[in-house]
């Protein structure tokens, strides 16, 4: 999956079973990307929206509950990509490309995992792509007027090229253990 509009590209390759619900996929995406699952989300697959129905965020297309549909059920054999939006305020759009559909027994290690990726996920509530660009300008320039406040806000140094697949997999495993 690719975080749309990011340059350089922020992307992750994950492996998940086809019998996983969209709600569970959402948690795997969160862990792999580095998001904290602090905001609403939705998937749009073949024009149908799936998510957590919320009266405040009613769209023209009614949302179906993402915990009631598996990947197998919504993807079939024809769907090769779909979108995932996280944080409707910041509007993080992800394009998810389907490489292959596997059953759990065929998966490496038998559990969902992040296989590869590049570049750090933007901090939560940074303000979308525009806010992220401003954040990067401030954090990378010690003379920038907002440098110190942005470092404090994000909790210290931030490496936009930083991505650790092992850390992503620890987060995925942690969520899987909590979900059991």
Locate the predicted segments by residue.
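Short linear regulatory motifs enriched in tryptophan with gly/pro/ser
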Residues: 1-180
């Amino acid at each position: 999956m690719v975080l749309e509009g990011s340059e350089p590209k922020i992307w992750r390759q994950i492996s998940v079973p086809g019998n996983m619900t969209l709600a569970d996929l959402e948690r795997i995406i969160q862990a792999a990307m580095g998001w904290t699952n602090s905001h609403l989300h939705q998937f749009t697959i073949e024009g149908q929206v799936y998510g957590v129905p919320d009266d405040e965020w009613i769209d023209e297309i009614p949302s179906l509950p993402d915990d009631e549909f598996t990947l197998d059920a919504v993807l079939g054999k024809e769907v090769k990509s779909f979108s995932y939006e996280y944080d409707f305020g910041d509007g993080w759009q992800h394009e998810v490309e389907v490489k292959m559909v596997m059953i759990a027994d065929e998966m490496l290690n038998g559990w969902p995992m992040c296989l590869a990726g590049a570049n750090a996920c933007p901090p939560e509530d940074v303000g979308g792509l525009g806010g992220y660009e401003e954040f990067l300008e401030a954090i990378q320039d010690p003379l920038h007027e907002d440098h110190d406040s942005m470092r404090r806000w994000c909790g210290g140094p931030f490496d936009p090229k930083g991505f650790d697949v092992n850390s992503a997999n620890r987060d995925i495993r942690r969520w899987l253990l909590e979900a059991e």
